[in-house]
A protein has these predicted regions:
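Conserved catalytic core of sirtuin-type NAD+-dependent deacylases
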Residues: 1-273
């Protein structure tokens, strides 16, 4: 059967090869923190300063790394694949975008966006977000969108400008990272489910197979008849659900797989199941 419709899921293993820490290390911690202390709504209510500091550090780190060969290969597939394609990432970094991917969906949100809990507005945000972070006036640099700079931001008594200000409603200290935390619903689940049920080929890259609902994507795709491939540094918890498994570094295996898929497409040959 010809492959016309592809869904790809990427996880932390893809960005790890660019130098970003995986979601959980061998000790169960994420950059030295328990997940429940920095990645839940309860943690944010309990200690917003800690949560903001954690994501400010992740955002700063993101600015020091570059897309790797896996990101670049997937962007090439996006550009050259003639059929339907949806790249769903669990990662909150922007490395897929920087590599050039367009048909992309961030199911767990984006580190480079803010979300105002006062008005619901979302916007680009690449600098510090902590309410304790302030810059001398006038505001310069990447922390504000152009709209925020034009509208102005409240100043402290010392004449410095608050960083955590919504560019829409101007609420101070109400902007949180646009990240889906544990206990919150991932984005675009209806669209993802529709794509999984319609795809001919599902490929999971660099995921642990431990975090739902993404861990269940292979079951949906395979039940609906898709050929399923896992590309991972080691077999995931759900590797037995895939038709085939390719073990190794994403930066090596993904470019080879993309060459394979595009080569078969160029010759109008079916990708066998």
């Amino acid at each position: 059967m010809d492959i016309r419709n592809i869904v790809i899921l990427t996880g932390a293993g893809v960005s790890a090869e660019s130098g970003l820490a995986t979601f959980r290390g061998p000790d169960g911690l994420w950059e030295g923190h328990r997940v429940e202390d920095v990645c839940t709504p309860e943690a944010y209510r309990r200690d917003p300063a800690l949560v903001h500091a954690f994501y400010d550090a992740r955002r700063e780190k993101l600015g020091t790394v570059q897309p790797n060969a896996a990101h670049e290969a997937l962007a090439r597939l996006d550009a050259e694949w003639p059929g339907e394609l949806l790249l769903v990432t669990q990662n909150v970094d922007d490395l897929h975008e920087r590599a050039g991917s367009k048909r992309l969906l961030h199911m767990h949100g984006e580190l480079t966006k803010g979300w105002c809990v006062a008005c619901g507005k979302k916007f680009e945000w690449t600098g510090p977000m902590s309410p304790n972070s302030v810059f001398p006036e006038p505001v310069e640099g990447p922390s504000f969108s152009s709209a925020a700079k034009e509208q102005g931001s409240p100043s402290t008594s010392s004449g410095r400008t608050e960083v955590n200000v919504c560019p829409g409603c101007h609420a101070v200290g109400r902007v949180r990272p646009d990240i889906v935390w544990f206990g919150e619903m991932p984005y675009e689940m209806e669209r993802i489910d529709e794509a999984l049920r319609a795809c001919d080929l599902f490929v999971s890259i660099g995921t642990s197979g431990a975090v739902y609902p993404a861990a269940g994507f292979v079951q949906t795709a395979r039940y609906c008849g898709a050929h399923c491939i896992e590309i991972n540094l080691e077999p995931s918890l759900g590797s037995y659900l895939f038709n085939e498994s390719r073990v190794g570094k994403a930066g090596e295996l993904v470019p080879a797989w993309v060459d394979e898929v595009l080569g078969q497409s160029a010759h109008s040959s079916p990708i066998s199941r």
